[in-house]
Curated annotation (Swiss-Prot):
It is an enzyme of class 7 (translocase). The chain crosses the membrane at residues 272-292, 522-542, 576-596, 610-630. The keyword Membrane applies. Its EC number is 7.6.2.-. ATP binds at G41, A42, S43, G44, S45, G46, K47, S48. It comes from Photorhabdus laumondii subsp. laumondii (strain DSM 15139 / CIP 105565 / TT01) (Photorhabdus luminescens subsp. laumondii). Pfam families: ABC_tran, FtsX, MacB_PCD. This is Macrolide export ATP-binding/permease protein MacB. Its main location: membrane. InterPro entries: AAA+_ATPase (IPR003593), ABC3_permease_C (IPR003838), ABC_transporter-like_ATP-bd (IPR003439), ABC_transporter-like_CS (IPR017871), MacB-like_ATP-bd (IPR017911), MacB_PCD (IPR025857), Macrolide_Exporter_MacB (IPR050250), P-loop_NTPase (IPR027417).
Amino acid sequence: MNALLELKGIERSYPAGEQQIKVLDDVTLSIYAGEMVAIIGASGSGKSTLMNILGCLDQPSNGEYRVAGQNVAELNNDELAALRREHFGFIFQRYHLLTHLTAEQNVEIPAIYAGAAKAARRQRAIELLGRLGLEDRIYYQPGQLSGGQQQRVSIARALMNGGQVILADEPTGALDSHSGEEVMAILKQLCEQGHTVIIVTHDPKIAAQAQRIIEIKDGHIMSDSGTQVSRKITQTPSLTSKISSIRQIFGRFNEALFMAWRAMVVNKMRTLLTMLGIIIGIASVVTILVIGDAARASVLSDIKEIATNTIDIYPGEDFGIDDPVSKQALKIADADAIKVQPYILAVSPEIEGQMRLRKGNIDVSSKVTGVGDEYFQVYALRFAQGIGFSLDMIRRQGQVVVIDKNTQRKLFPHQKNVIGEVILVGNMPATIVGVIANRESAFGNSKLLHIWLPYSTMTSRLMNRSYLDSITVRVKDDYNSKDAEKMIVQLLTLRHGKKDIFTDNVDMLVKAAEKTAHTLQLFLTMVAVISLIVGGIGVMNIMLVSVTERTREIGIRMAVGARTSDVRQQFLIEAILVCLVGGVLGIGLSYTIAFIAQLALPGWHFVFQPIALLSAFACSTAIGVIFGFLPARNAARLDPIEALARE
């Protein structure tokens, strides 16, 4: 009969400074299926190290170890995990149950890593616990169970995937005599059912209950009572209800997500404090994007209210150059020539001056602008009362005037409707035909008085001149204002025979404002991103602490068959989940901030663009991956023996 477990010349040494301490020396041993073996020895004899090598938790420094003919040294980490998962079941002296899980959930862990279907593993866990007399303790957590009951849960976990080989390390060491007897009776029964049971103990009474006793001292096998397998070996039951590889991967991810969520819920305060940096960072980024967009839209709306797609044409070379000849370059005919161009929506000649206004005993100074009939369309001005100028008023040099709200309040402090009233502009009587409404603007409203007359009235009746101070044109929306500006300059240069005018494109102001707003928003976003990175570093720090605190849990998971990728995935998912939940709460906080800001700034419109929300989630995920990778990698690299030894 071939040996199930075969060791040849096994040695195990550990470094101690510059020396090597040999714990096992030339151990040669064969264990057959169906045996109940007791390995007995005093503390420091090497019995626990031998058990760890038998259970593939540790590897020998020298020698050869075969499991069912397979040389263990030829297996990689994942293959070793599969061997532990599918062939071995561990029973520890201190039970090594996960305190935040129920008895059933603890028993299910090996089957989760084996990729078993959820319903099948749950049914088997309940069945095993029932067989061990714990049917009424299925949903109890370890802290609610006695020592004997916890050890029975540990036995059920060892049997979950079949447990062909049961490795029991001092299984009765932490139990009272009655509970110890019950555990030994269960182990004997398992041996009778076909399981290979290996007990590591220092107690001769426990060892005497085994069929075979191997004594170890100072790393050497001192005695071996020999193999006594006479019964027929039966097939050990195992959990065979597996799922397809794709569904298995999805199932493992789903379980890792569920376990990560449970770990977060168990440590609520720590999780919340970990999230705090992410919440503030995400809220900052989203709020800056939303409020920045609202502020930019408000400013641009105000600029466009002043004039959009407009070009101002001035005589001379530039502002501040006072040349009497160039000052007279613009004529009414130039405005007429521009008006017929296909890219022009509206044109208005302009003449400006400062004059006295009188009504009764009220005498004030006001800015006066002579304009064309399309001026109010060019500047998108709204009328509170009346209308603008008609072509007929322009042609007959009408003594009509449009005033602003400031002028109305000054000249008619107690009168609401002023249409048809006559005021003196200089010495010329003029009838009011319209009142311009105030603009609601982030820039505020002007306190100056401003009135408008037909430009023909200004040139002939008040100023006695034929040239213009400027011409304002509005370009059609489907034309590029920059191209239109070039064509206007070319047209007037051709008409005048030289370039004696210059232009001011209001769209350049709009673009400059957009650029400034974008730059400011980018700067504030970078500040918010820095806070987000700080939050990410906080997540990494807490996760590193979590790995240290949960080292024993990691060792337990590895002992029952978790791959390094399973451990890495679980801690990475925890980090990502913390960041995603923090991201959701951060977005919620930004909605609250925007709601408060909306109450304070009713003229602004706060819109949460999908791209901003998607960016927030993308940032949360990226931070979870980036700052969760190091803790996850550290967790996956832990040695299961060292991890299990941690308290």
